[in-house]
Amino acid sequence: MATAGGSGQPLCSGPPARTSALPAKKEFDVDTLSKAELRMLLSVMEGELEARDVVIEALRARRKEVFIQERYGRFNLNDPFLALQRDYEAGAGEAEKKPVCTNPLSILEAVMAHCRKMQERMSAQLAAAESRQKKLEMEKSQLHVLQQEHRKLSARLEDERGKNKQVVLMLVKECKQLSSKVGEEGEKLEEAASKLDAEKRKTGELEGALSAERQKSSQMEARMEKQLSEFDTEREQLRAKLSREEALTADLREEIDKMRKTIEQLRKGNDHKPSLSLPRGKAKDRRSVSVSVGTEGPASRAAACQTDPVVEGADPVKKPPVAVPAKPSSAGPLASGTTKGGVGKPSVGRQFSHGDLLTSSSPSIPGPPRIQENGPSSGSTPEPTGSALMPLLNNAPPPAASQNHSLTSSTPNLHSPCANAASYPALNPRVQAARFRFQGNANDQDQNGNTTQSPPSREVSPTSRDNLVVRQLARNTVTQALSRFTGPQAGAPASPRAPHPGEGGTGPPSGGRASAKTPNAPRVDRGNPPPIPPKKPGLSQTPSPPHPQLKVLKDSGRPANAGAKVDSKTGVPPPSAPPHGIRVMNEENLAKSSSPQPPPKPAGDLAPAVPAGCALPAVAASQVGACLGCNPGPSQPACSESSHAIPTAIACSSSINPVSASSCAPWASHSLLVAASGWPPSLTPLLTSCGPVSLGGRPTRLHQAAAQGNVTLLSVLLNEEGLDINHACEDGSSALYSAAKNGHTDCVRLLLNANAQVDDADKNGFTPLCSAAAQGHVKCAELLIAYHADINHAAEGGQTPLYLACKNGNNECIKLLLEAGTDRSITTSDGWTPVHAAVDSGNVDSLTLLMYYGGPESENSGSKDQTGLGSREESRGAMPVISADLINQADKEGWTAAHIAASKGLKNCLEILCGHGRLEAERKDKCDRTAHDVATDDCKHLLENLNALKISVRISVGEKQPAVCGSDDFEAENTICALNIRKQTSWDDFSKAVSQAVTNHFQAISSDGWKRLEDLTFNNATESSVGLSVSSILSVKLGSVTWSTGQSFSQPPWDFLQKNKVEHVTVFLSGPQEGCLSSVTYASMIPLQMLQNYLRLVEQYHNVVFHGPEGSLQDYIAHQIALCLKHKQTAAGFPCEIVKAEVDTNFSKEQLVELFINSACLIPVKQPPVSKKVIVILENLEKASLSELLGDFLAPLENRSSENPYTFQKGNGVANSYYFHENCFLVGTIAKSCLQGSDLLVQQHFRWVQLRWDGEPIHGLLQRFLRRKVMNKFRGKVPSPCDPVCKIIDWILTVWHQLNSCLSRLGTPEALIGPRYFLSCPVVPGHAHVTVKWMSKLWNAVIAPKVQEAILSRASVKRPAVRPSPSQGQQAVVKAALSILLNKAILHGCPLPRAELDQYMAEFRSGCFPLSMVSSYSGSHRKKGESGSWRKVNTSPRKKSGLSSSQTWTKQEATKDGVRNDTGHQNGNSIASLVKQKSLENGHPQVLHLDQRLSLGSDDEVDLVRELQSMCSSKSESDISKIADSKDDFRMFGSSRTDPDPEFSPTMSDRSLPSSEKEVCPLSSNPTLECSNNTPKPESGVSRVKSFLPVPRNKVAQCSPNPKRSNSSSSSNTRQREINNNLKEEFWVLRKNIQ
């Protein structure tokens, strides 16, 4: 046993040893081991377990050996007990044997199990200990941190205390300094005020002295001006006299020179020139007219001769001159030019022969030898002939000087620079210089025949102006005379590109005429450049005058160049003959150069000149053989920019061919036939398109007749046999082509009926239909199409008739061709389509037709619009009929129609192109440029917005809008703008755009006036005047998706909005639910700052009352403030409830107590305060007595605690005590401007918030509200101030302000009206009468009853009403006041015209006074300073005597009764009046004749009379009548006032008659009526008391001594704000303090 016990001892010692090792293991922290160490520890532990298992297995295998060893190895023979035991065990059976001692294996297993349990228990205890240790460490760390923070806060608190002490000390010091400074500033202010008064006095004195000096200076200036005018007149007279003397001297010198030359020529034996003889009888007449240039004197004798004007017959009805015969010769241009016949005798009796040639030597430039008619004249130079001058009073240009000149001139005007601009070697350069000097400096006629004068150097008196006209005509005459010598040669025509004749080139001879030039003729110096000749002869817009008569030459034996001489009977044209030449307006060169300029090269000699705007007649053209060739293709219209500059009104260039002999034969038979057939009223520009052919050729005549539209000649020619009607000229054009080109429908019909080829094209491939379409001749085109012309024919360049029509903008032709089914897609050789042509020319209507005409929409609109265009808005909604390929067709350069429109800035065309849904705006040309790359700025903006989505932005008002009386048209959302969302728009851009739109809207509605959005400066950071900004936005809804500013989605805005089909963006503002008042501010237009201030007052004082005039939104403000306060308290965790009660006349104090108790405002004294917040709103407190209703609650409300209880006794006699707790808020509303009587006792116990009509927030509320309403109607845009809607809104604002101002002046504050009634003003653009009707209803339903009640209550406030109905005097006062208010406040400024307003006058309840008595209340018809409707009113009594009058009316006519007021005492005064009264009851008017007397001593009507007197006796000037009465006439009762009583003349008027308070009508301002005994006749200068009562027009007209002053009684339209605490004498009171 000892062995067993000894052997077991080591086994049982294991667990204690492991237990003793636990404290050592505590130092081993598993949490601090790394991952690798933890893996090592795990592996070690696993190895230990495996080793333990091996040991156990080994012990089990060796248990027998161990047992034997333990049992027998230590036994010996010394112990007998051991031997016995051994024997016992060996002898007995194994089953019966019992172990002597415990099995060691079982002991080992038990020990091992016990060790395992202990190990698990210790591990659990170790883990718990570790967790507790960790928690303890964490708490220790937190405690340490808190201790550190506590130390820091303590230190900071000490620092703040020190700083606060320093700040307090500094503030105290600053307060002391400021107080001392205030005293010093007060002293300085007093000193400055005294100095200011002194300066004002000095300034007044200086102003008086200055005004005196101004008067003196003005008088001196007037005298100086008079003297200067006299000096100017005298100077001009002397100048005129000097010019006459100079002219006379020059004429005498000229006569002397000519006589000397004549004598010399006679001596040489030149007797064959009878034209050189000068009749002496005419020399005397020459001295009567001055021909000198007004601004220059003659430089030398030779120059004076060269610049003398040549006479031109100006009056065709004067006696014709004697023709000077001339022999046929081959003389040069000068010789032929000097043999022209004379002209008409001037009106001054002065006349010269055109054959007077004065010769003088030319030493500077030797001229070549020249051939003269009767032999050479060596060394002689022809000079212009002097002539007389006749003033052309009718501004008619002079007729032709010679027929030869008319046949050879190529000028559109005699005075045109291109008329005589050619330089010829046979002329003296001094002559040319003089000629162009007159052309450059003279204020000659412009190209339309109008006299265009340059500003004269001095033009003071009429004499100088007359002299200027004389000088002007002198210059014109000289220019005409010189043009004859510098005109082109008749026999030397030249093409525009031919060499100049002066440079050595010579033209072919014509008709036997020999050239006068020699091949070696030197060039003449051309001097300075001449004015630029006109380049657009086809732009003349003057009508075509009658065609000139054909002049038949009698001398058939003369050559062609001798045709200058004509018979004297035919040489003078009839009075209706057109001026010689063609006047063509040059749009590019209207301003002429003032310096002399040399002549340009001649553009070519054309055949006979015709009047402006007319084509050349066929006969006249054929006489010279001038046939005009056409450009390739049909000619452009006369106003086309590409037309060449030629003299006649044609649009194609022409090369002039030599004259054929046959064409000049005057005896040709067909010439007479054409002449006899009659000229058409209008000659076309394109007369022929063939070469020079004989006039006898029938095809030529056929072309000419077709071109001119001569149906008679054309029908004669078509009836001839053997005529080829399809004959083509050199350019390939036929007669049908010419007729179609010139728009002669009858000729086209004749040719087509004669089987002319309808598609016969010219050399360039243009058919008659192409020509008609290009020129816009729709009737011709319609005929050609009816005869099956090819509508898709393409010329050589690919131009189709549709292309040409689009190019020239001929919409009717386009429509005709489209109806005929022409192809829109045919391209030219350059790749252009008709769409390109229409866009290139900028024809919007043509492009619209191309894109939309032919569809169902255009068919429907065609019945409404004859042109088929329809409105552009309708075409935008229609579907285009052209394909996408055609709209995107590119030319050779890759340009589409969009490229062309964008590059030229044609925004309208580009907008129509963009209307096609399949336009490829991003298509590039061959240079990789899109339409956007080549576009202008406007077109770039249009292209950027091509695919943009237009999303309207709205601001939700919801249920926060104020309840408006009678308004049912308020919208829950207001549209503020429309955003363009493009594909490239990001969410940041979208957020900025929305924010900017909201900010702009806030700024617009709160700005002054109708300023446009672009005129205002906006900034996101700044708030509007109402306090709203971007921060006021709560959320934004994109359709049904909620979005906030700055938020982004995965899709871009464009895709997101298009996918969700968002049509508008709704902006929600922060409201009372969020504890904010932004939405309330926007809904009511009350500034946010003021609402926040009201909320603060309710939270701070708990007892607040809002009071103001009726309709000042007191109830709305109280409810919104309570709602916001409720949500704020709820958000803070306090339950809150709003209790609303409406007070009426039957509302008792017991009901109020029950309300307080039920709402938990009053709680029993024994009950502790509750945490529930209660807001009680008492509305309409003005209907009850405040002292009776709230008198017992004043102390408990002011001191809320159980110490100040309120004892309430119930009906059963039980009395309970209650008190108000701190969580109760009481808000009241009163529709009254001020308290009176006993109610003033309640005032000090509440916080009162006054809502004044003339102060914010009420003063500008109506303006902001109506402006927002107007902007909503105009989709967020601000209309122009001139828009009728703006004018009607301004009128409504003026009505409200003027109405309250007048009521304030009348002393009736209870009648003041808030803006609530005016918020329902209808805004209907284009229907101003709707607003006027609404105003009449508002007047009848609200304004008039309130005014009537207020006036009656004022008049009878001193005594109770004895009678159930108002007396006649009271009714008279009410009607007079209503008439005053109607005309002064309501009708004044109405934008409706007078006639329209007359129709609505019967709807206003104020009487039936004729509207003619009302002054110009429409502000649009009078200037602001002239408006007589508003006058500054000061109702203090007048101190001067005046005149009074009385007016009475009957039903049919107004009759005047004298009202005499005798001077007397109180008991002797009486007033007699006759009043017409119209009863409005049951709609039947009744006339009441009141003949009763109102005693001034009675207490019944005296107050009313005094009130009427007070109204009519203000210091403002009245426009109705004067009250003729002395200040001593009325002495009523003893008055405490020291000032004399104002005068009064009672006037009874109908309540429906419109009148004016401060001005009524343009009646006489000082009518003389029957006056009192003391003042029988009014004197001028005596101050008169003004009456505001209406006066009939007929009576005023009878007694008005000066009717011209009827409209002069107007004053400035200025008003100032009326303040309730003004002086008593500045009010219109309806009751005086009478003792």
UniProtKB/Swiss-Prot annotation:
UniProt-annotated location(s): Cytoplasm, Cell cortex; Cell projection, Dendritic spine
Bias (Basic and acidic residues) ranges: 193-205, 264-274, 1453-1463, 1615-1624
Chain segments carrying region Disordered: 1-20, 193-219, 264-469, 483-582, 856-876, 1420-1469, 1531-1624
Presence of keyword Repeat: yes
CDD domains according to UniProt: bZIP
ANK repeat start and end residues: 697-727, 731-760, 764-793, 797-826, 830-859, 893-923
Keywords tagged on the record: ANK repeat, Cell projection, Coiled coil, Cytoplasm, Methylation, Phosphoprotein, Repeat, Synapse
Positions with biased composition (Polar residues): 402-414, 454-466, 858-869, 1432-1452, 1546-1555, 1563-1577
Asymmetric dimethylarginine carried by residues: R484
InterPro entries named among the record's database cross-references: Ankyrin_rpt (IPR002110), Ankyrin_rpt-contain_sf (IPR036770), Cortactin-binding_p2_N (IPR019131), Multifunctional_ANK_Repeat (IPR051165)
Pfam families referenced in this protein's UniProt entry, alphabetically: AAA_lid_NAV1 (PF25408), Ank_2 (PF12796), CortBP2 (PF09727)
One biological process term in Gene Ontology: regulation of synapse organization
Coiled-coil ranges per UniProt: 116-273
Low complexity bias: start-end ranges: 320-331, 375-395, 439-453
GO cellular component: a single term: FAR/SIN/STRIPAK complex
Residues recorded with modification Phosphoserine: S1498
Subunit structure: Interacts with CTTN/cortactin SH3 domain. Interacts with STRN, STRN4/zinedin and MOB4/phocein; this interactions mediate the association with the STRIPAK core complex and may regulate dendritic spine distribution of the STRIPAK complex in hippocampal neurons. Activation of glutamate receptors weakens the interaction with STRN and STRN4.
Function as written in the Swiss-Prot or TrEMBL entry: Regulates the dendritic spine distribution of CTTN/cortactin in hippocampal neurons, and thus controls dendritic spinogenesis and dendritic spine maintenance. Associates with the striatin-interacting phosphatase and kinase (STRIPAK) core complex to regulate dendritic spine distribution of the STRIPAK complex in hippocampal neurons.
Protein name (database record): Cortactin-binding protein 2
Taxonomic source organism: Ornithorhynchus anatinus (Duckbill platypus)
